[in-house]
């Protein structure tokens, strides 16, 4: 699945100038798969998806739906979802390292009439899941286990009702419950009881997509979501390009002083990663919308910066790479990201370790990182089987000759084409 050979990160001695097309959004693809599955399971009919991302995370979601007895047809970015929830005996769902599968599929499995066992990669066993399982128990769903592996004993239906959950470790707890809530007999009310929610815009994305499927959702009260019971409308879904994956390429323009154009950039996206544009503009970058494309022209130089990434934690590795490559001596403070300690790896510890390994100066705080830009040296950059860490290493390698990413294959989680796209971007600029 992942490369075991170190990957020499391409060095860019001159500004990068490139046009890049990134595949569909992982967040949208996996949400549309679940919504399409629920519509089919209710007997409402089949749904189609175009622009779907095909990567390890989305393939794991497809396999999870198929394990539950649903049909997902199509081999590329065009998919059709149909069928009913009829799992085979001794059904097992492999979550891999995909948080969306780990947290979106169990409420769906609760609607089955059979036991479903969930497991995943070794690193996935450290990812937070207990609050979601406790919430399912609170809704009357028998669940064995407090973490991977665990078993959901479906009874064919879920009564629904009101459930309190501390989602401060992951907004996906809320999204996972909301996605299936309309299929519960009495609907669902979710009340967040913990500290400030991370990645709240991802919940807003879930709510918007539920409404597009005809679901009545009331989110007028902060930290409370009410999903009324009802049918999900089968429909055609069109996934936007994955803006989080695009961020690494935009960062290439910033750190090299070049120009990168992303094709198909949506004019009004529901993806939280669109907020990267505000960050890039504070770094003296020029952002232009040209027809259906987004173009970022990097500056000659930029200084350190302060940014709260609570709503866009997925951007942290790329933003940390930007901070490490800022003008020497300048300081960046990345805040609001304590929850990243429970992502694919402890991203705060990983970023601090890898930046410092190359001679940088990165310190952890209670909720983030403080990075003082210093000249970096060649060396190995560990990915920790984390796609975003691998991409961050590639960004650093643009300005530091001799950086090797130990596992660039980790990018297959959300962008299998990353090594090829990255190399083409750099090599296409060298002439």
From Swiss-Prot:
GO terms for biological process: amino acid biosynthetic process; aromatic amino acid family biosynthetic process; chorismate biosynthetic process. Keywords: Amino-acid biosynthesis, Aromatic amino acid biosynthesis, Cytoplasm, Transferase. The active site is at residue 314. It is an enzyme of class 2 (transferase). It catalyses: 3-phosphoshikimate + phosphoenolpyruvate = 5-O-(1-carboxyvinyl)-3-phosphoshikimate + phosphate. Disulfide bonds: none annotated. GO terms for cellular component: cytoplasm. Pathway: Metabolic intermediate biosynthesis; chorismate biosynthesis; chorismate from D-erythrose 4-phosphate and phosphoenolpyruvate: step 6/7. Its EC number is 2.5.1.19. One of its GO terms (molecular function) is 3-phosphoshikimate 1-carboxyvinyltransferase activity. SUPFAM superfamilies: EPT/RTPC-like (SSF55205). Belongs to the EPSP synthase family. Catalyzes the transfer of the enolpyruvyl moiety of phosphoenolpyruvate (PEP) to the 5-hydroxyl of shikimate-3-phosphate (S3P) to produce enolpyruvyl shikimate-3-phosphate and inorganic phosphate. This is 3-phosphoshikimate 1-carboxyvinyltransferase. It comes from Mycobacterium ulcerans (strain Agy99). The lineage of its organism: Bacteria, Bacillati, Actinomycetota, Actinomycetes, Mycobacteriales. The gene is aroA.
């Amino acid at each position: 699945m992942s490369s075991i050979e170190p990957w020499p990160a391409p060095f860019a001695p001159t500004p990068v100038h490139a046009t890049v097309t990134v595949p569909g959004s992982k967040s949208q693809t996996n949400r549309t798969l679940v919504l399409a599955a629920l519509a089919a399971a209710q007997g409402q009919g089949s749904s189609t998806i175009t622009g779907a991302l095909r990567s390890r995370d989305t393939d794991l979601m497809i396999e999870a739906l198929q394990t539950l007895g649903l049909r997902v047809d199509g081999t590329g970015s065009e998919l059709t979802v149909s069928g009913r929830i009829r799992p085979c005996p001794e059904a097992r769902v492999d979550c891999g390292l995909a948080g969306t599968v780990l947290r979106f599929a169990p409420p769906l499995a609760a609607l089955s009439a059979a036991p479903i066992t969930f497991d995943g990669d070794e690193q996935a066993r450290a990812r937070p899941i207990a609050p979601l399982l406790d919430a399912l128990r609170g809704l009357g769903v028998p669940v064995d286990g407090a973490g991977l592996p665990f078993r959901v004993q479906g009874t064919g239906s879920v009564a629904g009702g009101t459930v309190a959950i501390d989602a401060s470790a992951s907004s996906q707890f809320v999204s996972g419950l909301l996605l299936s809530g309309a299929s519960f007999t009495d609907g669902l009310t979710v009340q967040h009881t913990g500290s400030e929610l991370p990645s709240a815009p991802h919940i807003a994305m879930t709510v918007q997509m539920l409404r597009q499927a005809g679901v009545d959702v009331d989110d007028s009260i902060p930290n409370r979501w009410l999903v009324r019971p009802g049918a999900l409308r089968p429909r055609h879904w069109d996934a936007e390009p994955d803006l989080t994956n695009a961020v690494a390429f935009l960062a290439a323009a910033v750190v090299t002083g070049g120009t990168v154009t992303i094709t198909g950039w949506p004019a009004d996206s529901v993806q939280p990663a669109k907020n990267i544009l505000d960050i890039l503009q504070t770094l003296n970058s020029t952002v232009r919308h040209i027809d259906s494309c987004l173009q970022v022209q990097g500056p000659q130089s930029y200084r350190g910066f302060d940014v709260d990434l609570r709503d866009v934690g997925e951007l942290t590795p790329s933003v940390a790479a930007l901070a490490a490559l800022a003008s020497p001596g300048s300081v960046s403070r990345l805040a609001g990201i304590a929850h990243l300690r429970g992502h694919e790896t402890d991203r705060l510890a990983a970023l601090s370790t890898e930046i410092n390994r190359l001679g940088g100066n990165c310190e952890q705080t209670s909720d983030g990182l403080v990075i003082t830009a210093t000249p970096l040296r060649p060396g190995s950059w560990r990915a920790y089987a984390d796609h975003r860490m691998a991409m961050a290493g590639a960004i650093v390698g643009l300005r530091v000759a001799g950086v090797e990413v130990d596992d660039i294959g980790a990018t297959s989680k959300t962008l299998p084409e990353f090594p090829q796209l990255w190399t083409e971007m750099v090599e296409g600029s060298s002439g």
